[in-house]
Amino acid sequence: FCDLGTLYNADVLDVQEDESGVIWHKINKPVETGIKVTGRIDWNRRFDFMQQHSGEHIFSGLAHTHFGATNVGFHLGLESTTIDLDVPLSEENISFLEKEANEAVYKNLPIEISYPEKDELALLPYRSKKELSGRVRIVTVPGYDICACCGTHVAKTGEIGLIKITSFQNYKGGTRLFMLCGKRAYLDYRRKNADVLRVTTSLSVKPEELCSGFERLSSEITEHKIY
C-alpha cells in the first residue's frame, strides 16, 4: 500500500513509480499547473501500517531463529495481516513466539536502518526473499531480526504497542498466521471483550466462567430437546 493524503487541496488516491523512476500521484481533482503545492501524509494510516510491518519483522525474525522458519509470504491488508511461514507450527510454538515478540515490544528497542557496504553486507545474517544487488537497506531490531526491507517502520519497538496472533492454519505444508498489532489489536480486544461481557451477563456468569457456562447451557438444551 502507498501513502495517501493530500496535495494542495486534492486528495491523493494512488501513488506509483514508473520504470524511469518518476513518481506519479493520482489525485481526485486537477491542481493548477506550475504552482508550488504542499503534500500531507495521512499519518493515522501510515502509523498503522508501520505498527503492522514492524510487528511482522519481530515475529518473523523469532520464527526464523527458533524454528528455522522462512517468511515466504506477507500481506498487509486494511483490516488484518497474514504471514506465511514454510514450516508447520503448533499452537504451543505460536504462543511462545507471540510471548517473545511482545517482550521485544516491552523493551522499547530502537529499530535501526542502515545501508552496509558490499563487504559488510556479505557477512550479515539478514533475511531476504530474493537475491539483492546494489545499495541494500537493512532493518535491524537488535537481538530479534535483521532483514532487507524498503518499507516503513516505527522508530522504537514500544510504538508497536501489542502483537497478537488471532488465528492460524496449515497452508501449503507450512503455517499461515493472522496478526494484529498496535491499535488494531486493541480495537479487536475491546470488541471481543464487549461480546464476552454481553454473553456472560446473559448466562449470569463471570467472564472467566464463560466456557463452563456455555457448556452447562448446551447440556441443558440437549437434555430438554424433543426429537
Describe the residue ranges of each PLM region:
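Active/ligand-binding-proximal structured segments within catalytic/core domains
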Residues: 1-7, 30-83
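Solvent-exposed beta-strand/loop surfaces of large extracellular or lumenal domains
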Residues: 7-22
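Short beta-strands and strand-coil junctions in structured, solvent-facing domains, enriched
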Residues: 18, 46-48, 184-187
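Terminal appendage regions of diverse proteins
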Residues: 160, 166-227
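Short solvent-exposed strand/turn elements
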Residues: 25-34, 180-182
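Solvent-exposed alpha-helical segments within well-ordered globular domains of core cellular machineries
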Residues: 61, 95, 99, 103, ...
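A generic structural motif
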Residues: 20-29, 81-87
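Functional cores that coordinate and move charged inorganic groups
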Residues: 45, 65-171
